[in-house]
Amino acid sequence: MYTEGFIDVTGGRVSFQKFDENGGGTPVIVLHGGPGSSCYSLLGLKALAKDRPVILYDQLGCGKSDRPMDTTLWRLDRFVEELAQIRQALNLDEVHILGHSWGTTLAAAYCLTKPSGVKSVIFSSPCLSAPLWEQDQKRNLKKLPLDVQETINRCEENGTTDSEEFAAAIEVFGKHFVNRLEKQPEWLEQKPSGYRNADIYNIMWGPSEFTVLGNLKNFDCTTQLKEITCPSLYTCGRFDEATPETTEYYSSLTPKSKFHVFEKSAHMPYIEEPEEYLAVIGDFLNSI
């Protein structure tokens, strides 16, 4: 059964989709990346619905959700509140949480409010420390051709991260550390226009992946990961922006955690190795 609709949250309405093939199992709710992206690239996770309901939603300001102009809404605590409001609206008394990239920042911040009924949390290509993420990207940058490094550094220094040469350099970075597929799935190429909201990304992260200037600049929950006591799974790609070393470090700080690396992937193993990704995630959820 497929359901879609809108949920009222602080600041506007968010669009959600629910996939449910047999009505059994504890639901899993998926938190997309960004900040300011949408759930469309994660739609392949609906395959998990053979065992449990799967809920995807576009965070406020993104995708099909409302796009309010109030920039004070683009704060981590407001997105945490939004997740709580969605759970309440959908009567998700018990739930698994799967966050990807920025979605793991949101998942961790939410779990640290000690909500009831969270059966497990999956940190997929996690960002749980903005300073660590920034350090890792500086190291990743050094693995690229020298001219690409120089372009990115020059554009950051000159404030020209909106230029065509910066975009071209970022594309090279992406082919190394974000999505390494030569040919993208056809459904991914048909992405909806305007699904991203660059304003949210700029306010919360900044104009560049490599230097955090937004309001997440000081986010670091590593010292609190010991407080996440439900079962957890940390995953990343071998060539991920969310490096295996840092991801394993987060896992080591979290009780009841498991760690898995997708050997052929960068930051999007759910697209780069979809069968393996679904198998690992599905097995973990079914073990709870």
Curated annotation (Swiss-Prot):
Gene Ontology cellular component terms for the protein in this record: cytoplasm; membrane
Temperature dependence: Maximum activity at 40 degrees Celsius. Stable at temperatures up to 38 degrees Celsius.
Keyword Protease found: yes
Gene3D superfamilies referenced in this protein's UniProt entry, alphabetically: alpha/beta hydrolase (3.40.50.1820)
Major location (coarse): cytoplasm
A Pfam family annotated for this UniProt entry: Abhydrolase_1
An example Gene Ontology molecular-function term: aminopeptidase activity
Domain AB hydrolase-1 per the UniProt entry, residue ranges: 27-274
Subcellular location: Cytoplasm
Family listed: Belongs to the peptidase S33 family.
pH effect on activity, per entry: Optimum pH is 8.0. Stable at pH 5.5-7.5. Most active at 7.3 with Pro-beta-naphthylamide (Pro-2-NNap) as the substrate. More than 85% of the activity remains between pH 6.5 and 7.5 after incubation for 15 minutes at 30 degrees Celsius and it retains 50% of the original activity after incubation at pH 7.0 and at 30 degrees Celsius for 30 minutes. 50% of the activity remains after 15 minutes preincubations at pH 8.0.
Keyword match Hydrolase: yes
Subunit structure: Monomer.
Variant or mutagenesis effect after changing residue 101 to A: Complete inactivation
EC number in record: 3.4.11.5
Keywords of this entry: Aminopeptidase, Cytoplasm, Hydrolase, Protease
One example of a Gene Ontology biological process annotation: proteolysis
Protein name per the record: Proline iminopeptidase
Catalytic activity: Release of N-terminal proline from a peptide
Domain of life: Bacteria
Spans through the membrane: none
Activity regulation (UniProt): Completely inhibited by p-chloromercuribenzoate (PCMB) and heavy metal salts. Partially inhibited by proline and proline derivatives with proline as the amino terminus. Enzyme inactivated by PCMB is reactivated by incubation with 2-mercaptoethanol.
